[in-house]
Amino acid sequence: MQADYIIIGSGSAGSALAHRLSEDSRNSVIVLEFGGTDIGPFIQMPAALAWPMSMNRYNWGYLSEPEPHLNNRRITAPRGKVIGGSSSINGMVYVRGHAEDFDRWEQLGAKGWAYADVLPYFKRMEHSHGGEDGWRGTDGPLHVQRGPVKNPLFHAFVEAGKQAGFEMTDDYNGSKQEGFGLMEQTTWRGRRWSAASAYLKPALKRPNVQLIRCFARKIVIENGRATGVEIERGGRIEVVKANREVIVSASSFNSPKLLMLSGIGPAAHLKDLGIDVKVDRPGVGQNLQDHMEFYFQQISTKPVSLYSWLPWFWQGVAGAQWLFFKSGLGISNQFEACAFLRSAPGVKQPDIQYHFLPVAIRYDGKAAANTHGFQVHVGYNLSKSRGSVTLRASDPKADPVIRFNYMSHPEDWEKFRHCVRLTREIFGQKAFDQYRGPEIQPGERVQTDEEIDAFLREHLESAYHPCGTCKMGSKDDPMAVVDPETRVIGVDGLRVADSSIFPHVTYGNLNAPSIMTGEKAADHILGKQPLARSNQEPWINPRWAISDR
């Protein structure tokens, strides 16, 4: 079995790659995916987003090693094990990132990935239902829209931000990210619109694209060139041959794992496990970054939250409305209002992100408050803490060793303390007067730095945005894994294209920049001229040096 291009992983970037590489009928493409079908209400119904993430059928279910700065808790680290990868189990939140994020990438050695370079790819990939204005695309395969925004708590949140003196934004994915506004989601006609929906399924209708369900064991490297992938299916081990290139799009955990199993990585680590070293790249598995968040929860004194819909009977009603009519609560992820704020004067770009939810409940659907309530997921998104992904064993089926090293930088504590106090200021605005009851979490007794730190150690968790473990950079950077054209340094015919190549975490959710990475990598692979650079100038708060709002 062989093809011109073999793509490992059908997630956000892998699906985009499959679609773009196969547009030319002369190119044959094989996509390798271990996970099964995405058909079914648990994935397709937007409001059911908590279910697939908690199901072994759809999620690799990784756990970090004990995190020393978080009471030695092991933090859940889900990754999609299904057609569409993590885009099939995520929260469907659509955030491109800030212009400064991508300019930073270029400064770190990813030449050609500045904001002016990547904006045309964001436009190419999206079908924005907010219209085209020079910043947004309307002809792409990825549907992007706002939710219904019917709950009054969404409007109270945005109004509270205005009352607190913060900026408002009509389109945080357009010229102005900073401020309070309404959140966008990747849904369409009442369904999740994953990378599989947008890219992979249309590509699979072409005769030159094949999807193989299998377990990828390692990349076959002969004489310094990737020639195929060793896979396991039906109890048999075989090799799928690549006539041109192998592209790894297996996630920020599994992409470095595959490289190391194939002999590409830190030589000492590989030798310790008895793996033949093909290329010594010490950066493989290093530079792990993520977003952390906590839930700030408040009781609602009015029965307007989603709490009424939590009993099984009413969940069934909502499910039936969605199943038969594609209407009701089921058509939205319920993250319909948001904010992107700067933590202090002198901070040029937003670094605090809010997802507002009109119910008090954990992201995984557990530990719901036994009353009407509302919450925000609060995250400081530009942490300086760095972790790693290493091999547990030379056995391809052994889970990787994930060490996030969360909160290892002192600045993270300072920023998250500020997040707690800032959120109290926002929830204390007049817009919430008619809804605001007692604080559930952190709780009104949590006031001092020490009390806030104790709360954070017990309640901070991942926002599920890992990246950076196969860092893109210049060839003379010893910690870079791929060059700016996504080629693995030191191996011919091998690329990595997913969130693992991000030199620095972007500000916001990672599905959008991961898909963009697949789009742009496809042009590099095909030898196409990159899309023309944009001349749009993003909005930067003119008061950024002297004010946080």
Swiss-Prot record:
Its cofactor is FAD. It catalyses: choline + A = betaine aldehyde + AH2; betaine aldehyde + NAD(+) + H2O = glycine betaine + NADH + 2 H(+). One of its GO terms (biological process) is glycine betaine biosynthetic process from choline. One of its GO terms (molecular function) is choline dehydrogenase activity. The active site is at H465. The keyword Flavoprotein applies. FAD binds at residues 4-33. Pfam families: GMC_oxred_C, GMC_oxred_N. Disulfide bonds: none annotated. One of its GO terms (cellular component) is membrane. Pathway: Amine and polyamine biosynthesis; betaine biosynthesis via choline pathway; betaine aldehyde from choline (cytochrome c reductase route): step 1/1. PANTHER family: CHOLINE DEHYDROGENASE, MITOCHONDRIAL, GLUCOSE-METHANOL-CHOLINE GMC OXIDOREDUCTASE. This is Oxygen-dependent choline dehydrogenase.
